[in-house]
Amino acid sequence: MTLSDEDKITIEKFALQNAVKYGKAPQLGAVMGKVMGLCPHLRPLSKEVGPVIQHVLDEVMKEVPEEWQARLEVIAPELIEELNTKKEPDKGLKPLDVKEGESVVMRFAPNPNGPPTLGSTRGIVVNSEYVKRYGGKFIIRFDDTDPQTKRPMLEAYDWYLEDCEWLDAKPDEVVIASDNMEVYYDYARQLLEMGHAYVCFCEGGDFKKFKDAKEPCPHRGHAPEVNLEHWDKMLAGEYEEKAAVVRIKTDIEHKDPAMRDFGAFRIVKTAHPRPEVDDKYVVWPLLDFEGAIEDHVLGMTHIIRGKDLMDSEKRQGYIYNYLGWEYPKTTHWGRVKMHEFGKFSTSGLRQSIEDGEYSGWDDPRLPTLRALRRRGIKPEAIRKFMIDMGVGETDVSLSMDTLYAENRKIIDTIANRYFFVWDPVELEVEDAVCCTVNPSLHPSEDRGVRCIDIGSKLLVCKSDVESAELGDMLRMKYLYNIEITSVSPLKCKCIGDSMEDAKSNKMRIIHWVPEDGIPVKVLAPQGEFIGMGEKQIVDELDNVVQFERFGFCRIDSVDDGVVAYFTHK
């Protein structure tokens, strides 16, 4: 038993449906699974079906996405309809616990030691979206009270606000923690006076021994007036770094060592990078203390934080109980890992930039919003990507392909099409007739044509012709059919312009650029692509275009040749 023509059409349908659905090359396993699931008579022929499917996939990949869609509409319009009507799984944000008529106050609190990354973007988008839905106030609070270990960058304050506005998440209020040091000092003094805090002079290793043994350190029992005296000396700069720490009294026998008398203030004599602050303060709050005070002072109603910060909530609970405050409603979410970037930290990226490994914070290899924006990723796509992810404690592992799919829905209808030939080689067309061709700027949107003047020589991708042999026939897209007449030097002759002939002879379709094209350099996460492109590309500065058979790119500059940033396939 062999495969019938009907079986082969069925395979092509499912291959095209997979390609259209995901906007990229169809996967052999996925197509095989669907074919075997819906065509039981083919199951005994799996060894024969596999190569046929692979051949179909190879043919599909010779075409561009617009041609996939057009072909599928012809041979299986019902599969197009199925893609459009298939119910999406439940996505998005769950309702907040909000009383009727209550407005919400929510915040995103970054350390401005670098620009926003994909990791921090989730907090910006989700918190701002909840405020949009329920009404209230969205606050950006810069937790910049660590001038030494996670030292803030002055530029990052503005970068965060710029990126928030770009993401349609402009804050209603901006708070800078280092402006509020006197507020933290005031509450520290109150806790010292109440006997709920003390100044500890133990060296780190010594305090750990007491903590691990569930025993109080010698300073825990000091009277409030003694602690206040030490506190004033700390503020006056009379103690050296690491000589004294303010600790919050908790349960010294708590089963979790992290809960036992945690640190609230430490001495840091490194000047703050903000000129308004500089060396004005030498006693700095740790994040658990600063965040606890700010969340109350700002009237926070709901907090969304990583599940890795559950201990912070418990520690802050002691401060809230001592001061008679009610803790905001809190939701936790799991970590998000993007396959393409693995584990990264802002401080690590900063060091790599300083070491010259990356060109800057907008290097296309980085997971920063500045890099994604420069590549042509749209803010609407990022918002939808983050909102669809929802809020849950389960760790999430995702591919950038998911974000790219959302972005493709936005840019596909607005991106004009052009040819870009990377690693170009010259192809001489014998007896060529000079002419002008006018391909559409967009396959489905009526927005005009490109004007390409053709001479006797074309530039093509080396990979398209490096294995060419005498007599090979190729279709030059939008132009004519050719036959290779010489491989060194590379020459061909025109054998007509019939698309039907190209199909019947199963010619590969390749793209090209006239010999007087313009230099183009594409910067991509995987490296640089150097080549030539159509002259009209210079009119697309700051726009996202599609280089046919290559992918979407944002045109970054056109001053000395074209420099483009790769968006995605």
Swiss-Prot record:
- Record keywords: DNA damage included? no
Q: Does the keyword Cytoplasm apply?
A: yes
Q: Which UniProt keywords apply?
A: Aminoacyl-tRNA synthetase, ATP-binding, Cytoplasm, Ligase, Nucleotide-binding, Protein biosynthesis
GO molecular function list:
ATP binding; glutamate-tRNA ligase activity
List where in the cell it is found.
Cytoplasm
GO terms, biological process:
amide biosynthetic process; glutamyl-tRNA aminoacylation
Report which reactions are catalysed by this protein.
Answer: tRNA(Glu) + L-glutamate + ATP = L-glutamyl-tRNA(Glu) + AMP + diphosphate
Q: What is its EC number?
A: 6.1.1.17
Q: Which InterPro entries match?
A: Gln/Glu-tRNA_Ligase, Glu-tRNA-synth_arc/euk, Glu/Gln-tRNA-synth, Glu/Gln-tRNA-synth_Ib_cat-dom, Glu/Gln-tRNA-synth_Ib_codon-bd, Rbsml_bL25/Gln-tRNA_synth_N, Ribosomal_bL25/Gln-tRNA_synth, Rossmann-like_a/b/a_fold
Tell me the PANTHER family matching this sequence. Answer: GLUTAMATE--TRNA LIGASE, GLUTAMINE-TRNA LIGASE
What NCBIfam families does the database record attribute to this sequence?
gltX_arch, PRK04156.1
What does the record give as the function of this protein? Answer: Catalyzes the attachment of glutamate to tRNA(Glu) in a two-step reaction: glutamate is first activated by ATP to form Glu-AMP and then transferred to the acceptor end of tRNA(Glu).
In Swiss-Prot or TrEMBL terms, this protein is called Glutamate--tRNA ligase
